[in-house]
């Protein structure tokens, strides 16, 4: 029993995170030097994301009987994303207005260090809807894979899958090669995941060593408010959606606990993307649905980021005593419904989109970003965890709506009645 516990990735990552926190707190200078360990692990994961998405989407689409099903899946997924992300934005807006974590700070915007957020404000100027749509189209296929742009790779994979499907029996050889290549890629993922504890340790040691617990205490009310809101969203909103779909959100969270710990350690939801593609398929969702919903969700279904954006914007308004009446808040909500979709594939995307939103709204000081710059890193864990759970739930819901979900397999796996790889007939 003890041997199996020590070999568990869940236990190893949890232990590594704890050691990283202790090292960063008591030996901050050494903790800061651990940054390459976390960065290296995330880079290894990002290295493999593009080929994983390509193989999963191509084999999923090419193996489908009807191409109409692909279009239906995409439309249903986008509808779900828009509804749930809107709910997340509204919940964030309500909670921050009720708790008012920024009230009483009385910060003069002219005293804030605008230089500290200048880089985010500059990048925000390019984050328009048209620019976002144009960025989905790659200048070259090789460039899409080289840059690791998820949406560009996804677009090419969908087109490739459609073309391969139209070839029929002539494309069988190519299909078999890609499927075999996919097995090799997932073998590489298994090897990389053995390094997850090292990556989690390095990332956590750096975070605590660099920013310290003092930053947490200074703006702790906003952090606590944000974490509680994310928990309520997962338990109440996603939990209700899960119950209506026929599964328990708590059993699902237990099923993806290793992926959640990896995300907690690295603060990057992308670090769990390859494993999520595999685990959602093993849970009973059709490969074509998983291949479309998970990668697209990383751009259009960022529930945690949506909550963060509304709370951060209103917090800055409260702290700087900027006017935020009902009209301003509705305007903020409408702007965020559009601007939040431009966060895909951008480093520091939350901050960039927030800067773009503050600029678009007009009456909120962009320099106010400096207030939360120091604690943003501590809130990124909750954002990433909520995003991951949200995309997992979305995959199951969409699979059910388009009748591509194996209900028996879902129930068996979540209740530990069947091994992950066992298959059943699709239910209608």
UniProtKB/Swiss-Prot annotation:
Known PROSITE patterns for this protein?
Answer: NA_DICARBOXYL_SYMP_1 (PS00713), NA_DICARBOXYL_SYMP_2 (PS00714)
Quick one: which gene encodes this? Answer: dctA
User: What residue ranges are annotated as transmembrane?
Assistant: 8-28, 44-64, 76-96, 142-162, 184-204, 222-242, 326-346, 352-372
Tell me what topology the record assigns in the membrane.
Multi-pass membrane protein
Q: Provide a GO CC annotation, any one.
A: plasma membrane
Major localisation: membrane
- Identify its protein family: Belongs to the dicarboxylate/amino acid:cation symporter (DAACS) (TC 2.A.23) family.
Alphabetically ordered keywords of this record: Cell inner membrane, Cell membrane, Membrane, Symport, Transmembrane, Transmembrane helix, Transport
Q: Does the keyword Ubl conjugation apply?
A: no
Protein name, per record: C4-dicarboxylate transport protein
The GO terms this record gives for MF are: fumarate transmembrane transporter activity; malate:proton symporter activity; succinate transmembrane transporter activity
Q: Read off the Pfam families from this record.
A: SDF
Which SUPFAM superfamilies does this UniProt record tie to the protein?
Proton glutamate symport protein
Note the superkingdom of the native organism. Answer: Bacteria
A Gene Ontology biological process in which this protein takes part is:
L-aspartate transmembrane transport
Cell compartment(s), UniProt: Cell inner membrane
**Protein's job:** Responsible for the transport of dicarboxylates such as succinate, fumarate, and malate from the periplasm across the membrane.
Per the UniProt record, the source organism is: Escherichia coli O127:H6 (strain E2348/69 / EPEC)
